[in-house]
Amino acid sequence: MVKHVLFVKLKENTPEQCEKVKSLFLSMKDKVPMVRDIAVGIDYLHSERSYDVVLELVVDDREALEAYQVDPYHAGVVKPYIAEVRDGSTIVVDYEF
């Protein structure tokens, strides 16, 4: 199994924007076949070093993670939207467990 973790800072850190990003991330559970499990969290601390939204998703293996990256819904809908609303700052960690 591989876990993909993405931390995102948003240009507009409003509750509405955070919820929209959360909903979009969660929609991948039903639209991206290689996603086995998914969790999304919204930061409540809002410190200077905090990121606004975190995505954690699980896929079967490295090949599934590669397929996820080019999946039409992820690459064509989710990724472009996040690129538009993020402030340029993201952190990604991918690891096997």
Regions found by a protein language model. Name each.
Residues 1-52, 60-70, 93-97:
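Short S/T/G/P-rich N-terminal loop/turn motif that feeds into the first structured element of a domain
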Residues 80-97:
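Charge-dense polyanion-binding interfaces
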